[in-house]
C-alpha cells in the first residue's frame, strides 16, 4: 500500500479524510488572514509568532479554534458563534478544551 504524500506540513493527519479535512480548515484560516475577516485571526497569528511560535504551530492553534466552532455549529445545529470564536482566539495559546 502506497503512503499518501502529504500536501501540507502544517496538517499531519493519520487518514486521507483527516488530511483533507485538516487542509480545508487551514485553507479557511488562510482565507481569514488574507481577507482580514475577521482581523483578529491575523492579529492572533502575529501575536503567537511574536511569542515564539512558528507560523505552522500558530496556524495549528488557530485551526483548532476554528475546528471547535465548526464542530459546535454542526453538533448543536446552531449558527457560527463569532463572539466565542474571537474569545477563543484571544485566549490562545490556551486551547478552549484544556
Model-derived regions: residue spans:
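Structure-specific DNA junction-binding interface
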Residues: 1-98
